[in-house]
A protein has these predicted regions:
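A short beta-strand-to-alpha-helix junction
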Residues: 47-52, 69-74, 100-111, 191-193, ...
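Short, solvent-exposed turn/loop segments enriched in Gly/Ser/Thr/Pro and often Arg
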Residues: 44-48, 64-86, 126-138, 164-169, ...
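Long, internal low-complexity/basic segments
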Residues: 21-26, 33, 37-38, 64, ...
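Active-site His/acidic residue clusters
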Residues: 171-172, 176-181, 188, 221, ...
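Metal-dependent active-site segment of extracytoplasmic phospho-/sulfohydrolases and closely related
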Residues: 257-258, 263, 292-330
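C-terminal cap/loop subdomain of S1 sulfatases and analogous C-terminal strand-loop tails that border
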Residues: 139-142, 146-168, 183-184, 323-351, ...
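Active-site segment of extracytoplasmic enzymes that catalyze sulfate/phosphate-ester chemistry
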Residues: 30, 37-126, 132-144, 158, ...
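Loop/turn elements at helix/coil->beta-strand transitions in domains of secreted/extracellular proteins
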Residues: 24-29, 61-66, 119-125, 156-159, ...
Length: 584
């Protein structure tokens, strides 16, 4: 009770206030496509079989990063890396992706792009696909959609959420606004054939009133039909997401800067362009879908220009991973290379799996727009970049793998990035340091490969036998980055888990983690729903119990107090004084 009294008293001292330069700080928009390969934009692929004029406009009026990377090679881990500035393999997620329903990979107390900017006077919104886990009321057969969704974007720094929980193949498909579905997903569907695309499916009416449901297994998978709302249709996603984003921006507080995270569902399956785009381009339905995606990007740009917001809005356009395996058939049928000149695609440890479009447009901030930046940059770097931009200092337990690339924008300077770690959906590791890339191989094969990307971007010539000392040095750097809990400067911090098999090149003893007095910052406490307990009360005590209880070994009492106040300010007092955000 002493701790609760202290926190309750502290809340009276907290207030969210704007700063004198709120009206001059840039707005921030992150447009995040799904499975778009490096070669799926004409500014990166002059031989593309379709045109992307609006994406190209971002490049012509901004900076085109030709060596930009996502932090993993599939949806969930890349999204974690983008939002937190930390590699997802440091968490419990070592391989693959999440289902729609499970505890969120981001703990409430971990800093995100949204919480960073909200704490610095921004209004924050997410519109689109989440795919980091949510806590839905009940189970597939016992849903109570009058109850709120928990452990979701509103708990991770976003003031507003409108979108879907995950990829469409994982179900629970409805248009969610805040913590509630606009129309609950009370019907069921199987995947229907998609006759216009390669190896694809559809999610569209008619839907069923019941489904044959089998028990979920330990991994959270299930057999049976997907939960879906009567008004949901796959073909509507891009249009609805763009329209809702524009509506939110129209209703924003014009006296405060805003942050919009817009993760689209394209060109991920189902590949289903609207009729108006059929017949365009020369790459089948996939090309038409990319043309539609580009058109929606243009809608955002047109709105910003109309409202006089385009000059002072920082836009990052990028993708969560390389292209789906259908890239091989597209190359054969249409001579379109979704992976550009790079090896393989989605899920792969090679460049085609994680080198993606990466473009920043910010007229008021970029020096010499229209240029190309050829040094490495990672999506994890966005957190440190935005912190740098707003003049904020990242705490010790945030952005462990994030390095600011702001000088590359504002000064046209080259940033000497620390070694970058790549990670595949199968748990494989690689390390990139300058032009050198060491691929560690799979747990089974353990066939290490070394490539000189400056002379061999297609990763065709393995130099491991000729460059043994260089390979050994890279292995040592990789080991250090893994076990230190961070790749950027700062004291070592622990990862979230003990040793795992994918770290086969080091022993369990070598993995020994740094000690820290308090590890409650990353303690993952699932908030269970209790029928006899009011959600607001239970959430309040659960949140308090996850606050830091003591300072780090090298942390002053002032810094410790500031860390607690920062956590509470991020919640704006709502967790104790009333229901969680989005609940009445």
């Amino acid at each position: 009770m002493k701790k609760i009294s202290f926190i309750a008293a502290s809340i009276t001292l907290l207030a969210t206030t704007g700063t004198a330069d709120d009206t001059t700080r840039p707005n921030v928009i992150v447009i995040y496509t799904d499975d778009q390969g490096y070669g799926d934009a004409t500014c990166l692929n002059k031989n593309a079989k379709f045109s992307t004029p609006n994406i190209d406009r971002l490049a012509h009026e901004g900076v085109l990063f030709t060596d930009g990377h996502c932090s993993d090679t599939v949806c969930t881990p890349s999204r974690y890396g983008l939002l937190t500035g930390r590699y997802s393999w440091r968490t419990e997620l070592k391989r693959g992706v999440f289902q729609a329903e499970r505890p969120c990979l981001i703990p409430d107390q971990r800093m995100t792009l949204a919480s960073l900017l909200r704490d610095n006077g921004y209004q924050t919104a997410m519109v689109g696909k989440w795919h980091l886990g949510m806590d839905f009321p009940g189970t597939r057969t016992t849903r109570d959609w009058s109850q709120p969704v928990l452990d979701m974007p509103l708990d991770k720094g976003f003031d507003y959420f409108w979108g879907i929980p995950a990829s469409m193949n994982y179900g629970v498909l409805a248009w969610f606004e805040g913590r509630f579905a606009k129309v609950p997903p009370t019907e069921y569907t199987s995947k229907k054939p998609n006759k216009i695309a390669l190896d694809d499916y559809r999610i569209m009416p008619p839907y069923d009133q019941s489904a044959s449901v089998k028990d979920a297994n330990a991994a959270g998978n299930f057999s049976g039909k997907l939960e879906v709302a009567p008004d949901f249709s796959d073909i509507s996603c891009l249009d609805r997401f763009t329209t809702q984003s524009i509506e939110w921006m129209k209703k924003r507080n014009i006296d405060k800067p805003f942050f919009l995270y817009l993760p689209y569902t394209s060109p991920h399956k189902p590949v289903i362009p609207m009729d108006r785009f059929r017949g365009q381009g020369q790459a089948g339905a996939y090309g038409e879908f990319m043309i539609e995606t580009d058109w929606h990007v243009g809608r955002i740009l047109d709105f910003l220009e109309k409202e006089g917001l385009d000059e002072n809005t920082f836009i990052l356009f990028t993708s969560d991973n390389g292209p789906e395996t259908t890239w091989k058939k597209r190359k054969e049928l249409f001579q379109h290379a979704s992976n550009g000149p790079y090896r393989e695609g989605k899920r792969s440890i090679y460049e085609g799996g994680h080198r993606v479009p990466f473009i920043v447009r910010w007229p008021n901030g970029i020096t010499s727009p229209g240029r190309t930046y050829s040094s490495p940059v990672c999506q994890t770097d966005l957190l440190a970049t935005l912190a740098d931009m707003v003049g904020a200092e990242l705490p010790k337990d945030a952005g462990e793998d994030s390095q600011s690339f702001l000088p590359a924008l504002t000064k046209a300077a080259t940033v000497n990035r620390v070694p970058m770690i790549h990670h595949s959906s199968r748990g494989e590791f690689a390390i990139r340091d300058t032009q050198w890339k060491l691929v560690m191989g799979s747990t089974k094969k353990r066939n290490q490969e070394l490539y000189d990307l400056s002379n061999d971007p297609g990763e065709t010539t393995n130099l491991i036998e000729k460059q043994t000392e260089r390979a050994q040095a890279l292995r040592q750097k990789l080991t250090h980055i893994v076990r230190s809990g961070r790749s950027t400067k700062g004291n070592a911090v622990p990862n979230d888990t003990p040793y795992w098999d994918d770290l086969f090149w080091m022993t369990e003893a070598e993995y020994q983690q740094p000690d820290r007095t308090v590890q409650s910052v990353e303690k993952k406490t699932k908030i269970h729903r209790l029928a006899s307990t009011r959600r607001s009360v239970f959430d309040a005590f659960s949140y308090i119990n996850r606050l830091p209880e003591a300072p780090y070994e090298d942390e002053s009492s002032e810094d410790f107090s500031g860390r607690i106040f920062g956590r509470l300010a991020n919640q704006e007092g709502r967790i104790l004084l009333k229901s969680p955000p989005g609940m009445s």
